[in-house]
Amino acid sequence: MKKFLIAPSILSADFARLGEDTANVLAAGGDVVHFDVMDNHYVPNLTIGPMVCEALRNYGITAPIDVHLMVKPVDRIVPDFAKAGASYISFHPEASEHVDRTIQLIKEHGCKAGLVFNPATPLSYLDYVMDKIDVILLMSVNPGFGGQSFIHGTLDKLRQVRKLIDDSGRDIRLEVDGGVKVDNIAEIAAAGADMFVAGSAIFGQPDYRK
């Protein structure tokens, strides 16, 4: 079994001191910095872009940066995030006109590529790209806003994807995002996830280590 990775979502951080807050959460045990990138088009919210990614790199953040694109179109912004220092770039297949080409674009720019599945998105998008992706991210809430409750049906979907990954024999991370808390993370891990995005559950605590 792979090492579990915790990916604090900076959407819940204090943006007035983002560099310091990000460094503190990594020092407390975070493994990966998670970016929720929203365009007020694919999802009804507007958040951050490549400039913030570059600023964190310039601040001295060396941990992997995991960019979750909730934007449409996807391809236009991929090179910008790669240049800004992204490590992983994941996108929603519904937001790309050509899923395979977008995966290739991400890889050509030196990043690991991921596909993101909303709660009601079928897994059939994986049928022809399992040999090309590095991350599968399952949304356990509907995308657009932080602080939502975990959708319990995601556990069955996690089990399905875990089997697909194991059967493929490939080194693919299984990430989950939405409503991950101290009281449900063990159950989520048991269903097959090995990378956990958490925002308010981490940044909302006085001591990030907890």
Swiss-Prot record:
This is Ribulose-phosphate 3-epimerase. Belongs to the ribulose-phosphate 3-epimerase family. The active site is at D36, D177. Catalyzes the reversible epimerization of D-ribulose 5-phosphate to D-xylulose 5-phosphate. One of its GO terms (molecular function) is D-ribulose-phosphate 3-epimerase activity. Its cofactor is a divalent metal cation. It comes from Serratia marcescens. Substrate binds at S9, H68, G144, F145, G146, G147, D177, G178, G179, G199, S200. NCBIfam families: PRK05581.1-4, rpe. Its EC number is 5.1.3.1.
